[in-house]
Amino acid sequence: MPLLTQYNEEEYEQYCLVASLDNVRNLSTVLKAIHFREHATCFATKNGIKVTVENAKCVQANAFIQADVFQEFVIQEESVTFRINLTILLDCLSIFGSSPTPGTLTALRMCYQGYGHPLMLFLEEGGVVTVCKITTQEPEETLDFDFCSTNVMNKIILQSEGLREAFSELDMTGDVLQITVSPDKPYFRLSTFGNAGNSHLDYPKDSDLVEAFHCDKTQVNRYKLSLLKPSTKALALSCKVSIRTDNRGFLSLQYMIRNEDGQICFVEYYCCPDEEVPES
């Protein structure tokens, strides 16, 4: 990739973060999966980049792009954090078009000089290089959902087609999705309460769609559909999903997404339970 040969060592030293990709879609596709708010907070460490989007202090989405997904990943500090307009970033990443020409890849080099500086994007396709400068902002403190593995009560790993089926079959005109996890039947049940009445979808723990089932005790929790609907973007791209609930009823949906080069990235959604559960 020409972009990889355009900078010498001295030019590198001015940047605290440099990351390059031969195929920009390996980044843009994952970021689109969490694009339900305009702004995002970016955290970079030697392990890679985490991009976080939040809404109403009730839901948080994190996209993880591991360092080895990049052809080049150089970070000069222990961690680098900045806030950015995600809508503008995605527009820039697709500046050569969102529908790729067969056999043509858009290469990317991202450079960040540090606090107060813009995020520099160098995009190259077919010998044409475009430079974008995106203003960065003071990072806001993100929510700590304190989703500790020791407090996880139930965990199910599902092939994503099973959850896609649920979202297409259940009546989504209601306000909430109810998730029931039990050591006994129905094991794993999704319920909605819409205009056409109540609907349920059950997954036996020995179903071909269920890859793992761990349940310590029965839990029934409700989550606002308006908070969960943005996660369907990640669901559509994913091959597997890990569904976990902790002792407070908080929900974690972790989607495993395989990019065009066969590498794995993760998108995780945290959602707090709906406290307005009606009396049965």
Swiss-Prot record:
Principal location: nucleus
InterPro entries (UniProt xref): Cell_cycle_checkpoint_Rad1, DNA_clamp_sf, Rad1_Rec1_Rad17
Keyword Zinc: no
Biological-process GO terms, alphabetical: cellular response to ionizing radiation; DNA damage checkpoint signaling; DNA repair; meiotic recombination checkpoint signaling
Protein location: Nucleus
The keyword Hydrolase is assigned to this record: no
GO molecular function: double-stranded DNA 3'-5' DNA exonuclease activity
One GO CC term, this protein: nucleoplasm
Tissue expression notes: Expressed in testis, uterus, bladder, spleen, ovaries, lung, brain and muscle (at protein level). Expressed in brain, testis, kidney, heart, liver and lung.
A Pfam family per the record: Rad1
CDD domains from the UniProt entry: PCNA
Keywords assigned: DNA damage, DNA repair, Nucleus
Role, per record: Component of the 9-1-1 cell-cycle checkpoint response complex that plays a major role in DNA repair. The 9-1-1 complex is recruited to DNA lesion upon damage by the RAD17-replication factor C (RFC) clamp loader complex. Acts then as a sliding clamp platform on DNA for several proteins involved in long-patch base excision repair (LP-BER).
Assembly: Component of the toroidal 9-1-1 (RAD9-RAD1-HUS1) complex, composed of RAD9A, RAD1 and HUS1. The 9-1-1 complex associates with LIG1, POLB, FEN1, RAD17, HDAC1, RPA1 and RPA2. The 9-1-1 complex associates with the RAD17-RFC complex. RAD1 interacts with POLB, FEN1, HUS1, HUS1B, RAD9A and RAD9B. Interacts with DNAJC7. Interacts with RHNO1; interaction is direct.
Family listed: Belongs to the rad1 family.
Protein's name according to its UniProt entry: Cell cycle checkpoint protein RAD1
Organism of provenance: Mus musculus
